[in-house]
């Protein structure tokens, strides 16, 4: 008799995805981040659901409802801070996961890669909307500044912004609709993640060497389930250390001041995970140019597969490309730092140079290094 996990229609899907899935025998800890992102999403949906039970999306009561959650709701403070810091963990895992894809050439699975980029945009949109909900100073002004960027679109820009706002400024209508979208988007992310996995399982996983591993596969369970559980335990450990010891470490103190349209904070800046894109936006003096650069800073990932010139897939045996990859990491850290600094000398110049370098690495230096490495290996 066939095992029920192989014959039952639902169990069969789970079996083929997480139990009997043939996986390369040499995938490293860098392949843990996919499952960690799944865990982050589950944590965010669960904590978010309990927060939504007590939150009110009205400009008069939003701020005090968040205060009420932290002070009066049983364990409300831990749910709130797990949700806020869970977003930071989500983005750390997301950047590591995407970085792994760039380093090991996983972008050659174009369908999986493109859905991954779509997921990244969706997660960023969800996080932005979530940041607006507590209705503190940074929530209000962040919402005003970021939605206002759409006014740079020719002809329809102003109408589009007012349509999104539901009026002539960020107000009650804006907050209500952002809460509605913030609630629904994680479920859309879940569906996209399922499609992401579907396409991945069509091709099978990549591995550090970048070579075909069909002749050397092992079952996902127990080898990688146990490895994933270790990763999950470490993720929860780091998250809980953050939540229990310094929950406001990554937040902005200005968000503890209720939103006031008449008083602009001295430095308007988004959460840390958007600072690199924010720095690129600010480095271009033209409004439309800045918005385009902002979108392209993520969208550039979609053209990486077309700029792959090396005959090898992974960077594992390509020292020149490795140097460029770590230069890119350093550049992203520099941009993150600049995004949090005021717009003054020397930060403006550093931001502009870092932005030029960011696009140059992807568009010029990496394709050229691939060609040079091919020549060095007489290919």
Curated annotation (Swiss-Prot):
One of its GO terms (molecular function) is metal ion binding. Heme 1 (or BL or b562) is low-potential and absorbs at about 562 nm, and heme 2 (or BH or b566) is high-potential and absorbs at about 566 nm. The chain crosses the membrane at residues 33-53, 77-98, 113-133, 178-198, 226-246, 288-308, 320-340, 347-367. One of its GO terms (biological process) is mitochondrial electron transport, ubiquinol to cytochrome c. This is Cytochrome b. It comes from the Eukaryota. Keywords: Electron transport, Heme, Iron, Membrane, Metal-binding, Mitochondrion, Mitochondrion inner membrane, Respiratory chain, Transmembrane, Transmembrane helix, Transport, Ubiquinone. Disulfide bonds: none annotated. A ubiquinone binds at residue 201. Heme b b566 binds at residues 97, 196. Component of the ubiquinol-cytochrome c reductase complex (complex III or cytochrome b-c1 complex) that is part of the mitochondrial respiratory chain. The b-c1 complex mediates electron transfer from ubiquinol to cytochrome c. Contributes to the generation of a proton gradient across the mitochondrial membrane that is then used for ATP synthesis. It is found in: Mitochondrion inner membrane. The gene is MT-CYB. The cytochrome bc1 complex contains 11 subunits: 3 respiratory subunits (MT-CYB, CYC1 and UQCRFS1), 2 core proteins (UQCRC1 and UQCRC2) and 6 low-molecular weight proteins (UQCRH/QCR6, UQCRB/QCR7, UQCRQ/QCR8, UQCR10/QCR9, UQCR11/QCR10 and a cleavage product of UQCRFS1). This cytochrome bc1 complex then forms a dimer. It is a multi-pass membrane protein. Pfam families: Cytochrom_B_C, Cytochrome_B. Belongs to the cytochrome b family. One of its GO terms (cellular component) is respiratory chain complex III. Its cofactor is heme b. Heme b b562 binds at residues 83, 182. Binds 2 heme b groups non-covalently. The keyword Iron applies.
């Amino acid at each position: 008799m066939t095992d029920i996990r192989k014959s039952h229609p639902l169990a069969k899907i789970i079996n083929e995805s997480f139990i009997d899935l043939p996986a390369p025998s040499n995938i490293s800890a860098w392949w843990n981040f996919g499952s960690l992102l799944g865990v982050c999403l589950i944590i965010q949906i669960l904590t978010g659901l309990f927060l939504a039970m007590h939150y009110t999306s009205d400009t008069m009561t939003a701020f005090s409802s968040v205060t009420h959650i932290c002070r009066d709701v049983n364990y409300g403070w831990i749910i709130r801070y797990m949700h806020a810091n869970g977003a930071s963990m989500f983005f750390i895992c997301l950047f590591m996961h995407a970085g792994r894809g760039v380093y090991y050439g996983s972008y050659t699975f174009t369908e999986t890669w493109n859905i991954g980029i779509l997921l990244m945009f969706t997660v960023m949109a969800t996080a932005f909307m979530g940041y607006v909900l507590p209705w503190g100073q940074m929530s209000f002004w962040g919402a005003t500044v970021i939605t206002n960027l759409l006014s740079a679109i020719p002809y329809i820009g102003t109408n589009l912004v007012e349509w999104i706002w539901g009026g002539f400024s960020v107000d009650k209508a804006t907050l209500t609709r952002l809460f509605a979208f913030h609630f629904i988007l994680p479920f859309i992310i879940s569906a996209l993640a399922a499609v992401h996995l579907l396409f991945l399982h069509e091709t099978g996983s990549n591995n550090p060497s970048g070579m075909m591993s069909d002749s050397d596969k092992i079952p996902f369970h127990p080898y990688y389930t146990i490895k994933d559980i270790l990763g999950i335990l470490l993720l929860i450990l780091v998250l809980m250390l953050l939540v229990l010891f310094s929950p406001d470490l990554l937040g902005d103190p200005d968000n503890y001041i209720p939103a006031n349209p008449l008083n602009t904070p001295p430095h308007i800046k988004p959460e840390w995970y958007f600072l690199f894109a924010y720095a690129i936006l600010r480095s271009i003096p033209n409004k439309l140019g800045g918005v385009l650069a902002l979108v392209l800073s993520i969208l550039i990932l979609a053209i990486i597969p077309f700029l792959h010139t090396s005959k090898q897939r992974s960077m594992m045996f390509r020292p020149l490309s490795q140097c460029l990859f770590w230069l890119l990491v350093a550049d992203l850290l520099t941009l993150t730092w600049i995004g949090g600094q005021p717009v003054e000398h020397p930060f403006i110049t550093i931001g502009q140079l870092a932005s030029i370098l960011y696009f140059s690495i992807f568009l010029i230096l990496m394709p050229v290094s691939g060609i040079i490495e091919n020549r060095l290996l007489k290919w």
